[in-house]
């Protein structure tokens, strides 16, 4: 059974968030958390928060299972474009440049590993 978490209206451009999403796609949850904690990207903080929420949602949906981070993996991560706020920046000769402040929606889906590796 899978669980998902959605973070909406994040004030980061979707392009920057997709770079972070690509780092953790398909990884084990404990490995993904380590990657996000050590990442220098600002968007990784929001991605880590959403990943922790997805793991908590999995535990909430499956109360009779005790599942650790090493038994879960990031099944899919996708970033959708959110609302774009249009602002004006004063420019020379009485003109104005348009500034687009972009946002995104981050969705993380976690699932249990089918055949856990024994170490």
From Swiss-Prot:
Organism expressing this protein natively: Chlorobium luteolum (strain DSM 273 / BCRC 81028 / 2530) (Pelodictyon luteolum)
InterPro entries with a match to the protein in the record: Ribosomal_uL22, Ribosomal_uL22_bac/chlpt-type, Ribosomal_uL22_bac/org-type, Ribosomal_uL22_sf
Pfam family, one: Ribosomal_L22
Protein name (database record): Large ribosomal subunit protein uL22
Lineage: Bacteria, Pseudomonadati, Chlorobiota, Chlorobiia, Chlorobiales
HAMAP family: Ribosomal_uL22_B
Functional summary from the UniProt entry: This protein binds specifically to 23S rRNA; its binding is stimulated by other ribosomal proteins, e.g. L4, L17, and L20. It is important during the early stages of 50S assembly. It makes multiple contacts with different domains of the 23S rRNA in the assembled 50S subunit and ribosome.
Gene Ontology MF terms in the entry: rRNA binding; structural constituent of ribosome
Gene Ontology cellular-component annotations: cytosolic large ribosomal subunit
Domain of life: Bacteria
Subunit structure: Part of the 50S ribosomal subunit.
């Amino acid at each position: 059974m899978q669980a998902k978490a959605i973070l909406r209206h994040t004030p980061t451009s979707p392009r920057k968030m997709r770079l972070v999403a690509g780092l953790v796609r398909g990884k084990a949850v404990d490995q993904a958390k380590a990657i996000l904690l050590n990442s220098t990207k600002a968007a990784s903080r929001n991605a880590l928060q959403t990943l922790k929420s997805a793991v908590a949602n999995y535990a909430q949906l499956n109360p009779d299972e005790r599942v650790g981070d090493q038994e879960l993996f990031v099944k899919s991560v996708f970033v959708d474009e959110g609302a774009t706020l249009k602002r004006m920046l004063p420019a020379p000769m009485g003109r104005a440049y348009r500034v687009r402040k972009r946002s995104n929606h981050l969705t993380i889906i976690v699932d249990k590993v089918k055949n856990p590796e024994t170490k």
